Amino acid sequence: MNDVPENANEDCPGATSADAGKAFSCTGCPNQTLCASGEIRRPDSDLLAVTDRLKNVRHKILILSGKGGVGKSAVAANLARALAVNDKIQVGLLDIDICGPSQARMLGVEQESVHESGDGWCPIVVKDNLIVMSIAFLLQNRSEAVIWRGARKNALIKQFLKDVDWGTLDYLLIDTPPGTSDEHISIVQFLLQAGSVDGAIIVTTPQEISLLDVRKEINFCRRTKINILGIVENMSSFICPCCSNVSQLFPRTTGGAEMMCNELSVPLLALLPFDSHMAKCADSGEDYFEKYHNSALAKEFEKLAQLISK
C-alpha cells in the first residue's frame, strides 16, 4: 500500500482511507492525529520534487540481495557498464548503500567530488552516457565510517532522488544494501509514491545459505508490490583461464537459483561465471568490458543487458 506512513502500525488502513486515524489498528500510532485531521493527506512537497526530478527517467530498477558478499554491487556496476556499451542508451547508477558504498571505487571515480549547479547536485560522469551518485563523493575521508540512524539515511536517499540533476535517462539502476532495511523501505516508498519502479533484480550465489535470504527478499518484494524482474546467480561457476574447464565454486545442495526460481515462479535472468579479472577491475576501477570484452562473463552481462532492455 503506497499511502502507508513508514512509521505506521502494522495493520495501517492507509493515510487516504476513510478509516485513517479512526480504525482500531490506528491506536497508539504516532500518525493517528495527523491522519484523523486529514493533514497527512496533503501533497508532500518533497515527493512532488522527486516526481518532477525523475519524470525523464524511463526505467528505474532496484538491485537487491539477501546477503552481503554475493557480488550485488559488482553486478550493478557491470550491468550499468553493459547497458552503456550502447552509446545511445543513457544510464544512471545510484548507490544507496549508505554505510558501505562501493560504486565510486568500482567505476574508477573515487577521487571525484560532487558539485552543485542551478539545477541541483551534479552526478559524477563515468563516461558520456553513464553517471553515478553515491555518499562516497560527499565524505571528506574515504575511510570515514558512516554511523547513521534510519531517519538520517532516509533523508539522504530522498535528497539523492529530489536534488540530483539526473536529467534524461533510459535506466536508473539503484544499488541497495543487502537485506531489507530502512534504506529499502524508504526507496520503495519514495519511488512508488512519486511515480513507479520497473522492478527488482535479486542477486545470489548458488549455495542454500544465500538462497535462504533471497526467499525473504522475494517475500519483501511481493509484500511491497515490487515486480521481480528476476534472479541473477553470481559466481555460478569457475572457468579455468588455462584450460577453459568449468567447475563449481559453491555446492548446489538444494539445486541453486534455478531450482528455487522454478519453485517460486520467479524468472532466472543469468548464471554468471566467476572471473578473477573482473574482481581486479572492480578494485582498480577499470572498465572490465573494455579490457575483456570477449570473456564468457562479459558475454553473459551483455545477454543480461539485452534481457533488461526488452
Swiss-Prot record:
GO terms for cellular component: cytosol. ATP binds at residues 66-73. [4Fe-4S] cluster 1 binds at residues 12, 26, 29, 35. Keywords: 4Fe-4S, ATP-binding, Cytoplasm, Iron, Iron-sulfur, Metal-binding, Nucleotide-binding. GO terms for biological process: iron-sulfur cluster assembly; regulation of non-motile cilium assembly. Binds 4 [4Fe-4S] clusters per heterotetramer. Contains two stable clusters in the N-termini of NUBP1 and two labile, bridging clusters between subunits of the NUBP1-NUBP2 heterotetramer. The keyword Iron-sulfur applies. It is found in: Cytoplasm. PROSITE patterns: MRP. Its main location: cytoplasm. [4Fe-4S] cluster 2 binds at residues 240, 243. Its cofactor is [4Fe-4S] cluster. InterPro entries: AAA+_ATPase, Mrp-like_CS, Mrp/NBP35_ATP-bd, NUBP1/Nbp35, P-loop_NTPase, YlxH/NBP35. One of its GO terms (molecular function) is ATP-dependent FeS chaperone activity. SMART domains: AAA. The keyword Metal-binding applies. Component of the cytosolic iron-sulfur (Fe/S) protein assembly (CIA) machinery. Required for maturation of extramitochondrial Fe-S proteins. The NUBP1-NUBP2 heterotetramer forms a Fe-S scaffold complex, mediating the de novo assembly of an Fe-S cluster and its transfer to target apoproteins. Heterotetramer of 2 NUBP1 and 2 NUBP2 chains. HAMAP family: Mrp_NBP35 (MF_02040), NUBP1 (MF_03038). Belongs to the Mrp/NBP35 ATP-binding proteins family. NUBP1/NBP35 subfamily. This is Cytosolic Fe-S cluster assembly factor NUBP1 homolog.
